[in-house]
Amino acid sequence: MELLLDFPTIGEPHYAQAIPASLLTEKQIKTFDLATNADPYAALSESATGVTRSGRTVHVKMTSIRSHFMPDNIEGVQVGDSVYFHITNLEQDWDVPHGFAITGLNNSELLIMPGETRTIVWVPSKVGVFPFYCTDFCSALHQEMQGWVRVSPRGSSVALVANKPSSK
């Protein structure tokens, strides 16, 4: 086989042009004040996370920060429950978003920007243990950002629980 042409694709980073950082820095918001997050389901610290049930509706108040979710182990969800994941990104750096996905979502994922709380609904259709994970590369330990939801049969007596941060 004869090679006809060998060159980088369009947008190859070596063709980038530099500009002075001062042109951008004055216009950038560098940190996000979590106190301005007015979402009623915002968990502004890991100690504010947890799970609650109201009939067939489960609310999970969750946080994400490099490189873990809290809680990252949830039990007692039942088949057919509407599970609302309310995820607050505790990052303060302007360029560290986190993603969230779990098997069976009606859309592919959720992207949560620093300081923001976003909500996604998941309805499990079968019994099992379902992994959730971060879909946006955030750090060298990105693959550690994962957790599990254990789904029990409808009417099960498995208590609704989630792990809490250790008191180190």
Residue ranges and their predicted role:
Residues 62-64, 77, 87, 102, ...:
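Hydrophobic residues in beta-strands and at strand termini
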